[in-house]
Amino acid sequence: MLTIAQHQFESRLFTGTGKFAASEIMLTAIQASQSQLVTLAIKRLDLKTGSDNILKPLLDRGVKLLPNTAGARNVKEAIFAAHLSREMLGTNWIKLEIHPDPKYLMPDPIETLEAARILCEQGYVVLPYVHADPVLCRRLEEVGCAAVMPLGSPIGSNQGLATETFLKIIIEQANVPVIVDAGIGAPSQATHAMELGADAVLVNTAIASSSDPVAMGRCFAQAVNTGRQAYVAGLGAVSHQAHNTSPLTGFLNDE
């Protein structure tokens, strides 16, 4: 069971709502993935009604919503988006995203840390999306973030765990849940992230862009469970040398 800010999740697969061809496909794929936390961009919401056509169906399925500040370019815009989401959705949970570069969507570490500090002081449950920077993740933990969400590779790239070396350090040092976010493009990559000791993964593009998002959602659910079970069971040590698993020639010397 994964606990974030006193909220428990049985599933360690978190999902997104973007890039699906249709809302019905998205809802069915999320259900197939067994995800219990779904992130959605605040900019998708209707400012007049505080919802969009997927909000109620998600809530009806018992999914916890994690609004995100995607599109925010600085501290001011991110805080405004967080305030807006709390007013519209009645939640103090926020996925903090600040990426001023529209081409590569790299998160701004300086603006993110400052926004996280302010939002934590205001009582938000902050889950920041950041580079796989162990020092930054430690600082975010110190200002009160409920979890950290380091990227595996650029958003939507499906490149997998390009930052594996740094993810290992973050996982080793963290005292809050580590959720690998962005770049996971295949179920095998999600399994590997969980084998490293990640507490959860967030997957969107790999499911939404699949030719069969519903089937892919099921695949990711199985992959995450397998990776977690392998981590708990304990993986064997990696060696650069061969080690025999049974005696090779000892019996030849017996008389």
Curated annotation (Swiss-Prot):
Keywords noted in UniProt: Cytoplasm, Schiff base, Thiamine biosynthesis, Transferase
Record: active site: 95
GO molecular function, one term: thiazole synthase activity
Substrates-to-products reaction catalysed: [ThiS sulfur-carrier protein]-C-terminal-Gly-aminoethanethioate + 2-iminoacetate + 1-deoxy-D-xylulose 5-phosphate = [ThiS sulfur-carrier protein]-C-terminal Gly-Gly + 2-[(2R,5Z)-2-carboxy-4-methylthiazol-5(2H)-ylidene]ethyl phosphate + 2 H2O + H(+)
Entry's EC annotation: 2.8.1.10
Binding positions (1-deoxy-D-xylulose 5-phosphate): 156, 182-183, 204-205
GO biological process: thiamine diphosphate biosynthetic process
Cellular-component GO terms for this entry: cytoplasm
InterPro entries: Aldolase_TIM, Thiazole_synthase_ThiG, ThiG
Major place of residence: cytoplasm
Protein's cellular compartments: Cytoplasm
Pathway the protein acts in: Cofactor biosynthesis; thiamine diphosphate biosynthesis
Pfam families: ThiG
Function, in words: Catalyzes the rearrangement of 1-deoxy-D-xylulose 5-phosphate (DXP) to produce the thiazole phosphate moiety of thiamine. Sulfur is provided by the thiocarboxylate moiety of the carrier protein ThiS. In vitro, sulfur can be provided by H(2)S.
HAMAP family the record matches: ThiG
Complex and partners: Homotetramer. Forms heterodimers with either ThiH or ThiS.
Family: Belongs to the ThiG family.
UniProt-recorded name of the protein: Thiazole synthase
Originating species: Shewanella halifaxensis (strain HAW-EB4)
